[in-house]
Amino acid sequence: MLCESEARSTLADPVPMAYLSVDAQGSSEVSLDDITINSSAGTVEVCSMKPADDPKTERSQMNKTGLASSSRPASNVWTTQQDGEVKLRMDEEGMGSEAPKTVHEVFQEAVSKYGDYYALASKKNGQWVKLTYKMYYDKCWKAAKSFLKLVLERFHGVCILGFNSPEWFIADIGAIFAGGLAVGIYTTNSPEACHYVAENCSANILVVENHTQACRKSLEIEHKLPHMKAIIQYGEELKEKRPNQYSWREFLDLGEDIPDSQLREIIESQKPNQCCTLIYTSGTTGQPKGVMLSHDNLTWTSIAAGRSLMLLEATEKQELVVSYLPLSHVAAQMIDIWLPVTFGGQVFFAQPDALKGTLVDTLREVRPTAFLGVPRVWEKIEEKMKSVGAKSSTLRRKVASWAKGVGLQTNLKWMNGHSEVPMNFRLARQLVYKKVRKAIGLDRCTKCFTGAAPISRETLEFFLSLNIPVFELYGMSESSGPHTVSIPQAFRLTSCGKEMAGCRTLIHKPDADGIGEICFAGRHIFMGYLNMEEKTKEAIDKDGWLHSGDLGKCDKDGFIYITGRIKELIITAGGENVPPVPIEDAVKEACPIISNAMLVGDKAKFLAMLLTLKCIINTESGEPGDDLTAEAIEYCQKLGSKATKVSEIISSKDKAVYAAIQAAVSEVNKRAVSNAQKIQKWVVLEKDFSVGGGELGPTMKLKRPVVAQKYKDLIDEFYADANTPTTTEERTSAVMWGGRKLPLVHSIVSLGSLQQIQRVLQK
């Protein structure tokens, strides 16, 4: 990684040649006029053009680089027009010099290499129904022809709303083949949010899973969408027939009279530097932004990520993955759709209630070789394992404790370059680790990943102690998914790894500790935000660097560490910048009964915290209940509390539990770098955060603006007293709220003074 001045000058310094190959069989070409190539440490921009009509003319237009001249070169590395073209960023050698390809070209290669291998597997009536890569491609081709029959216009959206399924994949890729834009919509979106996305991408077609979505969302907004032409329902048969509404079976038959040549002509006109997919951001602070991803964004990133992650091609050993994360998210699309197509992996679809409790059942049945879990998924597995462990015999618990100690120490040594395998580790592997992996379905999994949100060190160490290293990935929608990856050979706890081959990283305006904004460059950088020029200019600077909005640093070995979000930084009234995540994680680690923690105090005189307790989630609705988890109950019992419900703790102001929380907060405060970073007040909320409640996003990421608005009155009460606590006893007294009780919730900490807490802890 270069310093900022070197990095910027490198990107701005062109060199004269691109090393690219052109497929002689009529695939997309690359125009030299559309290329700006920089030195090997910098970037190159590339795009392709339509094949020439006359092969002789085509050859005459080639120069010594093997690139065709273009009459209409792309003029910039970004665009905001859905039919726009961009310069692709290529290197003169290495991973960044790979020839640009369209989605169709990559899929054709997959069929050629992996045609008879299984690609997709979904459960029908309790049995796995599988499609080979040839069958998968044929269905995408049929879907594309049916989209053309429905008069899908070039660069107009096909919105897909539903849980992961073969139909979701086929609709997505079929839309791209047909020249449209594949657009995922979160199933949790309101009709208003669905309308915004569909209108923003000029959607022609809406593909939904079931009758509920068709009626409550699509039909409610259909009349407001001038470009809408049809609604397709794939998860169940139509309950009532409406004009321009089709079942999945009817839809696939629609295009039978569309000649293959018509679709082939559209496919051959596609270029790697054109948009094919839109990923909509969550829009927690405004309307969602449509992240435009090109063919090259998807195809290049998938091969770069796969090689960096050491994925195996199916011809060597087929990778197996479980699809369950929302496909509207770029991480799920890259892991579930594009990486498998590129490397011939087999995708198994989990049940729709996977995140409500059935995921582990699917993992045990499939036994994947690679698995991506967002932090909340890993935390839930951790909680479940701890709950089961708590019910074991004393002997089993002692053996497990010993094995975890051995596992953590051995893996930490491996992480730092040691290679020996101690005898006690081998014994622990036979007695504990193998059984644990089998119990959660990860006994064949050599690649366990986490991403999309910060994960705590405690959770990483828990799995590491069981010989399950969880490797962090880091990126964003605007980088087509991953930018950095962790692998067994390059792994550090709390680091998100090293940049992928062909990618570059810049720490913008680093402070004395080397912490600054993380910026990206490479072929994975998005085209722009659809119809949002100013937002695009804010994201991509004049030198072509994508500003992530994340704060971080890079160590001497090239490992990148994320320290917080610029927008999430709490700036106190005294002007001190406070990253909330490390403080929140520290409180959760210090007090095992805490489920979620959110620090507040922006522009305020001191910090305060909202807390929730670990409770059992309703497997049907996904809503947090009142019953404490087994782990939480065990923790209460150790404290001397008989509580088994959240409401019992809150209504009685359970002294043992509240004192333990305060002790944890005090312990965290002792490690604070300044008084401004100490938690002065806290409150326990009556209900845990959830996707349904709006506090968590589809990937379980905390939506701070939503929480802040939802609990605005309560947060305001934190600061109702204008005086900032200054002494230890005054601070503690402030934490206890002086016995006041608010009407909004009944969980305000009100134990009284510091001495009162100490007496409880001493019992």
Swiss-Prot record:
The record's function comment reads: Mediates activation of long-chain fatty acids for both synthesis of cellular lipids, and degradation via beta-oxidation.
Biased composition (Polar residues) is annotated at 62-78
Lineage, uppermost ranks:
Eukaryota, Metazoa, Chordata, Craniata, Vertebrata
**Family, per the entry?**
Belongs to the ATP-dependent AMP-binding enzyme family. Bubblegum subfamily.
- Catalysed conversion reaction: a long-chain fatty acid + ATP + CoA = a long-chain fatty acyl-CoA + AMP + diphosphate; (5Z,8Z,11Z,14Z)-eicosatetraenoate + ATP + CoA = (5Z,8Z,11Z,14Z)-eicosatetraenoyl-CoA + AMP + diphosphate; hexadecanoate + ATP + CoA = hexadecanoyl-CoA + AMP + diphosphate; (9Z)-octadecenoate + ATP + CoA = (9Z)-octadecenoyl-CoA + AMP + diphosphate
A molecular function annotated in GO for this UniProt entry is: arachidonate-CoA ligase activity
Q: Where in the cell is it found?
A: Cytoplasm
Q: Which gene encodes it?
A: ACSBG2
This protein's GO CC annotations: endoplasmic reticulum; membrane
UniProt keyword Membrane, yes or no? no
Q: What is its EC number?
A: 6.2.1.3, 6.2.1.15
Q: What top-level class of enzyme does the UniProt entry assign?
A: ligase
Region: Disordered, residue numbers: 47-78
What name has this protein been given in UniProt? Long-chain-fatty-acid--CoA ligase ACSBG2
UniProt-annotated binding residues for ATP: 281-289, 472-477, 550, 565, 678
Organism name: Gallus gallus (Chicken)
Q: Where is the composition biased (Basic and acidic residues)?
A: 51-61
